[in-house]
Amino acid sequence: MLDLTQHNELVITQQVEHLEAFVGFETANRYNIMTEEGQHLLYAFEESGTISRQFLGSHRPLSIHVVEDGTRHVFTAQRNFFWFMSHLHIRDDSDKHIGSLQRKIKFLGRRFDLEGPDGQLLAEVRGRLLRPHTFMIHKPGGEEVARVTKKWSGLLREVFTDADTFRLQFHKDLDQDFRMLVLATAFAIDMDFFENNNKRGGFGFG
């Protein structure tokens, strides 16, 4: 399996189908994960129902599968349908539960809790009100250990598609499991905060 500890910066780019871009029909999310230099490392794809994508929007139940070389499984992030606060569970290639991501209520910003397999708090993901595209990941003691930033994709790409690009930065001492949790965090941020339900269909829950 790819050793994520060898990469302290990654870029995630979303792939958008022409049907979704021009008609607004919600298709399953797909992402390329690469180095800052553009070297392809991993591929991620959503598994969900067509009807739930159209009518439940960003609240739909789904799984995100991350694979290497097209077939080798790296990890899966899974969540059930939710009304208010999403809860994403992450399992590695051996189906071991390595942690979860729980969205929390925050009135002046955005927040997730990163939890270990036993529910212990590993880190807080904080998005400030005045910096809506930057999410900082802090250990309980306050040290920032990772960051997820939504990058500007260009005017036409931003206006006519929902395609997003994210930059991930890791502290050099983070282990493999924690880096997988940060990758899953980027997917959750995209689905919870940057999916355009008005264009993508759905009842506009979130």
Predicted stretch roles:
Residues 1-63, 72, 79-86, 93-96, ...:
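Low-complexity or membrane-interfacial segments used for flexible interactions
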